[in-house]
């Protein structure tokens, strides 16, 4: 049954409900929130509705009695062969043969548009994802957010949303100062100045690479003695490793130490400090953009945190005017507990500096000021405590907090078979997204990142992702697509071609249970996309593609698509030609849906493997 026919079936039930309301069997204000679902067991029909069960309380009657009244009130429809009442009151609908094949017509008529809808046409949604600090290359954890955010964005577009993908560039604040100072200290080292590098500095080799570029460009123009930079700076943290292998602090304060180095670097360099900050920022941000672009992840907007500096004070003034700010211990606090948060939050410190939370309030107000109907934030699971305070701020500003959806994405662990891969080291090295992509390929990375619910940890098996077996779901799904392509190549090599008209005429030959199951599953694709998109659950689509590939492989292995006579150079009989064209039609439909689904997930659909 096509999506249009599903809508027709829903309309038939609405008509029956109208009759019951008119007869006084149901209250006039009763709202129909029932569901029409595809059955898994063919003996239960093609579709089932729970409408009688949902209406029973309002009708003050047994669900089966309500079901009988609904069935009796249903208008006739040529696509329906039979209707049964089952169990406690489910209404099972059996379609006639012609109606079952309507989905194949839809697939070939709509092509890449099959399954897409305009249900949310005209609504604007912003999806913000990754938004990693531009202080280092992206690691494998960021990769999951990238794959998830891009897939969700594609799915939302598939159901009609006008989607803006956004990366929030955290280019302001203390982390950028730590990066700038780390770069400057490495620059001193490249110029021969001995440096005691801070524990809290950025340790990676990429910082030294940026520093080397700056030396090439500016020689020793900005060199100062390290003693000047470290003057009056609190002692850095000193650690030892105890008998249990744990790092134990002996003395010093790494935070105070790096802050002192930052302050002295700014004072000594003056305007030159911005040179180091901007050089590091532009280099790392360019690397991030290249990495994501190579991963098939793109954005309509790269939004700079610096750009909202001027919006922070006005938004705090709004909160103050509304009575939601107060002073305590020199800090300015936001009354987030008034809106369900566990405690109030500081928005301006005693030293006059606004907090990161204050920037986030301004940023989220800015999002809705830009006219988005809905905003989706894809955050790491470690941000779970941050959600209530952001929603509290929106409520305080008079913005409907339900317009903000936050999806928390859990962490990723890498495995090689039974051995867990170390994700990082003390030297500052970590497994990057680029390294993962180069080892397993973009397709495997994109698929396995979204193949599980976002709130579930991902155990990424590197060896499995590279294997060519049915256990590797990416290979298994793509191989189904390639198999159809191979059949068409063999057909062409034999001097024959696909006859779409004959395939449509003969499709009623597809009566095997496996063929009926395939057609039924193809018909489920539009509803699958809708559910996957509205719930921000791309794993629903990966599961669907896995099921479709499995059904196809099983059918393919048990049924010949091309007649045996072709391999011996004989001309197929009329019956063989009829069955061949019918099965080619079904195969091409499967190929098209797999290609469409893989495309929404950002994966390729290879013609050979």
From Swiss-Prot:
UniProt lists the family membership as follows: Belongs to the class-I aminoacyl-tRNA synthetase family.
Which InterPro entries does its entry note? Answer: Arg-tRNA-ligase (IPR001278), Arg-tRNA-synth_N (IPR005148), Arg-tRNA-synth_N_sf (IPR036695), ArgRS_core (IPR035684), DALR_anticod-bd (IPR008909), Rossmann-like_a/b/a_fold (IPR014729), tRNAsynth_Ia_anticodon-bd (IPR009080)
Entry keyword set: Aminoacyl-tRNA synthetase, ATP-binding, Cytoplasm, Ligase, Nucleotide-binding, Protein biosynthesis
From which source organism is this entry? Psychrobacter arcticus (strain DSM 17307 / VKM B-2377 / 273-4)
Q: What reaction does this catalyse?
A: tRNA(Arg) + L-arginine + ATP = L-arginyl-tRNA(Arg) + AMP + diphosphate
* Subunit-structure text: Monomer.
Give yes or no: UniProt keyword Cytoplasm: yes
Q: What is its EC number?
A: 6.1.1.19
Question: Record's HAMAP family?
Answer: Arg_tRNA_synth (MF_00123)
Q: Which SMART domains match?
A: Arg_tRNA_synt_N, DALR_1
Tell me what this protein is called: Arginine--tRNA ligase
Task: List the GO biological process terms.
Answer: arginyl-tRNA aminoacylation
NCBIfam families linked to this entry: argS
Q: What is its main location?
A: cytoplasm
Question: Where can the motif 'HIGH' region be found?
Answer: 132-142
């Amino acid at each position: 049954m096509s999506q249009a026919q599903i809508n027709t079936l829903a309309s038939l039930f609405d008509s029956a409900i109208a009759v019951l309301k008119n007869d006084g069997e149901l209250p006039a204000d009763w709202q129909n929130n029932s569901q029409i679902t595809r059955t898994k067991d063919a003996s239960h029909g093609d579709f089932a509705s729970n409408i009688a069960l949902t209406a029973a309380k309002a009708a003050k009657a047994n669900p089966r009695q309500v079901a009988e009244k609904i069935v009796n009130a249903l208008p006739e429809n040529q696509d329906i062969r039979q209707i049964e009442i089952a169990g406690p009151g489910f209404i099972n609908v059996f379609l006639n043969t012609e109606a079952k094949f309507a989905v194949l017509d839809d697939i070939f008529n709509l092509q890449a548009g099959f399954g897409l809808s305009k249900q949310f046409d005209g609504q604007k949604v912003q999806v913000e994802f990754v938004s990693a600090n531009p202080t280092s290359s992206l690691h494998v954890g960021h990769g999951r957010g990238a794959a998830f955010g891009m897939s969700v964005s594609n799915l939302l577009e598939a159901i009609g949303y006008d989607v803006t993908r956004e990366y929030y560039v955290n280019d302001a604040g203390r982390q950028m100062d730590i990066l700038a100072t780390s770069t400057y200290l490495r620059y001193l080292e490249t110029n021969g100045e001995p440096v005691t590098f801070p524990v809290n500095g950025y340790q990676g080799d990429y910082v030294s690479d940026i520093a080397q570029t700056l030396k090439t460009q500016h020689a020793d123009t900005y060199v100062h003695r390290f003693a000047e930079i470290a003057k009056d700076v609190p002692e850095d943290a000193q650690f030892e490793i105890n008998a249990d292998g744990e790092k134990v602090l002996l003395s010093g304060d790494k935070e105070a130490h790096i802050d002192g180095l930052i302050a002295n670097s700014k004072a000594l360099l003056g305007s030159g400090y911005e040179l180091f900050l901007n050089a590091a920022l532009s280099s790392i941000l360019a690397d991030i953009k290249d990495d994501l672009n190579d991963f098939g992840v793109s954005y309509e907007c790269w939004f700079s945190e610096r750009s909202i500096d001027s919006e922070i004070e006005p938004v705090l003034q709004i909160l103050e005017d509304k009575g939601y700010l107060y002073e305590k211990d020199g800090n300015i606090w936001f009354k987030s507990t008034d809106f369900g948060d566990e405690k109030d939050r500081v928005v301006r410190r005693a030293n006059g500096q606004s907090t990161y939370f204050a920037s986030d309030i301004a940023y989220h107000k800015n999002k809705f000021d830009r006219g988005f109907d809905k905003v989706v934030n894809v955050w790491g699971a470690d941000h779970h405590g941050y959600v209530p305070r952001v929603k509290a701020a929106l409520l305080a500003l008079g913005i409907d907090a339900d317009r903000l959806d936050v999806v928390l994405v859990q962490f990723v662990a890498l495995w090689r078979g039974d051995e867990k891969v170390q994700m990082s080291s003390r030297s500052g090295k970590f497994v990057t997204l680029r390294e993962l992509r180069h080892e397993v390929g973009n397709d495997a990375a994109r698929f396995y990142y979204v193949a599980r619910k976002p709130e579930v940890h991902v155990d990424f098996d590197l060896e499995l992702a590279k294997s060519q077996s049915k256990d590797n779901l990416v290979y298994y799904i793509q191989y189904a697509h390639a198999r159809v392509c191979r059949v068409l190549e063999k057909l062409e090599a034999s001097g024959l071609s696909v006859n779409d008209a004959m395939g449509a005429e003969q499709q009623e030959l597809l009566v095997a249970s496996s063929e009926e199951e395939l057609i039924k599953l193809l018909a489920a694709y539009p509803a699958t996309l809708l559910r996957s998109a509205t719930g921000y659950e791309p794993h629903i689509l990966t599961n669907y593609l896995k099921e479709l590939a499995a059904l196809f492989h099983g059918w393919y292995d048990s049924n010949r698509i091309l007649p045996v006579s072709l391999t011996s150079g004989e001309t197929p009989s009329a019956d063989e030609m009829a069955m061949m064209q019918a099965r080619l039609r079904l195969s091409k439909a499967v190929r098209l849906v797999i290609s469409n689904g893989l495309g929404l997930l950002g994966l390729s659909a290879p013609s050979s493997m």
